[in-house]
């Protein structure tokens, strides 16, 4: 049976064209073209201020994902903490299906829970408070009514503050809370969890389930997880 691929945390931006090049290389590969599905679990872009922002980066990425979708490969997207404002307009343009924060998949007989991963980091209370605020639909609607320049400046300011705060936060609170994560997996009656966000690529064998953490993309490295009937494995981009 055809495999499924999982990626996240590419943080694409015009400042790092090498990351976009890595993505295009993967999307154009024969492996991706022969997949049953590709799942993008958030933070595809380093920031997103609205589907109405038209740029060469956004357009080229949407075009290449659409080409893959047009080949019959199902492409799914879960919003991340950087691109949570991606909406149906961009997803339609790219030929992607937008998924909720949590989804359960039947992958070759294994019930698999997928999410971006930021909701699992419950020890970072300041971030969870911030997340709750910015995910209010009314606030998002008001934000998207602002001129694009204002939104871009505000997003840049928020990123600067977030970067400074991250430098002084203890590393452990920026990882998933083990007890909460286990409860979520049990609540969805899953056998496996796949998430991103923490940038700590690894396959963990927890008590009663497997937790797979997708890594971030940087320089010449792309974190790509292949799932098929034999299990799940990270495969270097050179293999595609």
Curated annotation (Swiss-Prot):
GO terms for molecular function: manganese ion binding; UDP-2,3-diacylglucosamine hydrolase activity. It is an enzyme of class 3 (hydrolase). Belongs to the LpxH family. Keywords: Cell inner membrane, Cell membrane, Hydrolase, Lipid A biosynthesis, Lipid biosynthesis, Lipid metabolism, Manganese, Membrane, Metal-binding. This is UDP-2,3-diacylglucosamine hydrolase. Hydrolyzes the pyrophosphate bond of UDP-2,3-diacylglucosamine to yield 2,3-diacylglucosamine 1-phosphate (lipid X) and UMP by catalyzing the attack of water at the alpha-P atom. Involved in the biosynthesis of lipid A, a phosphorylated glycolipid that anchors the lipopolysaccharide to the outer membrane of the cell. Its EC number is 3.6.1.54. It is a peripheral membrane protein. Pfam families: Metallophos (PF00149). GO terms for biological process: lipid A biosynthetic process. It comes from Neisseria meningitidis serogroup C (strain 053442). The keyword Lipid metabolism applies. Mn(2+) 2 binds at residues 43, 81, 116, 197.
